[in-house]
């Protein structure tokens, strides 16, 4: 028998999580005065008047570095809990981490050979 009251706390939590950002955006939208004008669409340059067009296109190499950084940053997030509980997890977890690191190294070598890490 399916008891729906078991999930009441989940639904309340979900409702609160959805309503808090909506409430915050609604309050600022209605409470703040409207600010229309040409200054609204310009970029802020630490008080200095912007020179030229401020909307520039970034080269793809910046995105590749950001992508590689993100991958290895997430790897660190996965490896830290494993490292803190290394002795309790045993040999199977050690082999899994070795496979995980090996896959990341293969990806890094592939990106390196494709020139994704070349700056010039």
From Swiss-Prot:
Top-level taxon of the source organism: Eukaryota
SUBUNIT field: NDH is composed of at least 16 different subunits, 5 of which are encoded in the nucleus.
Major localization listed first in the record, in broad terms: plastid
Enzyme Commission code: 7.1.1.-
GO cellular component: chloroplast thylakoid membrane; NADH dehydrogenase complex
Protein name: NAD(P)H-quinone oxidoreductase subunit 3, chloroplastic
Record-linked InterPro entries: NAD(P)H_OxRDtase_bac/plastid, NADH_UbQ/plastoQ_OxRdtase_su3, NDAH_ubi_oxred_su3_sf
Enzyme class, broadest EC rank: translocase
BP GO annotations: photosynthesis, light reaction
